[in-house]
């Protein structure tokens, strides 16, 4: 896969990557295809595997993928351990056209039916179930969408009803893309990325009405969060320093980051994310676990290991060991999920 400026589409191919109907295949081959595709992200349990089938089409629009899928009742889950193992990190913006999805992690009650919008964040744990279904899903890299969101880390398993006008607008756009992309070449399809991502952001940001005071608070939060993201590895970064920098009280700063578990929690989460990337990158293979922890704000290796394991379900050493298997296979890092998904039809 190319870098952030690249495209998943092949210059000599249309935006349609593949069209698969497993009813034309033996059951074993159908299940193998599902393991390769859905199983690349999720652990799944199919209620009646003997009757399994899926019909799917995947299209490419620059750096994003659009998938149409018909399949049978099943449960899908994505654990913190798996997140730490594969490092995949993107959003799934999904509309159920038929059937129903239900959240299953026990934290919140949420379900979606025909026309409703569901958002999944592959950097966070997932547990859900679906009846026999038809859905359309946009797979969007985090680096494209997160900077445009007011709350980029609060979208996982979020459901917004079909009666919301912005949801209706986005749904019409996505269905229009699905119908139009097969007739476009790679260059034309890539032009649709920016307006699509901006419409997603507008929908997710605009579905909760804010009064003026909440709007000001959101603007303050976004400004401070951006500063933290840019200076997250600075040794002097602290709650007190941020309060002085932005001229607000410690109490107000704590309030702004209450949904993140506090300022210190947000800083640690960002540092752990960067540390995980470093552990998986062969260019940093010469560094010890303790050195990587120190570079990312952890003075003591045991504290780094404990925080990392609590977040990702595995230790830094286990994460590096898994990455090393990939290095030994001659690859610098795990193939991007988008790269793999764009080539299932080849």
PLM segments and residue spans:
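Residues within the DNA-recognition helix of helix-turn-helix
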Residues: 256, 307
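Short acidic-hydrophobic surface loop/beta-edge motif
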Residues: 55-61
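Short, conserved glycine- and acidic-residue-centered signature motifs
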Residues: 86, 217, 268
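Alpha-helical bundle regulatory/interaction domains
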Residues: 2-55, 100-252, 259-265, 279-302, ...
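Glycine- and acidic-residue-biased ligand/ion/polar-headgroup-sensing regions
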Residues: 62-64, 70-77, 81-102
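His/acidic/aromatic-lined binding-pocket segments of jelly-roll/cupin-type domains
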Residues: 58, 83-86, 90-95, 110, ...
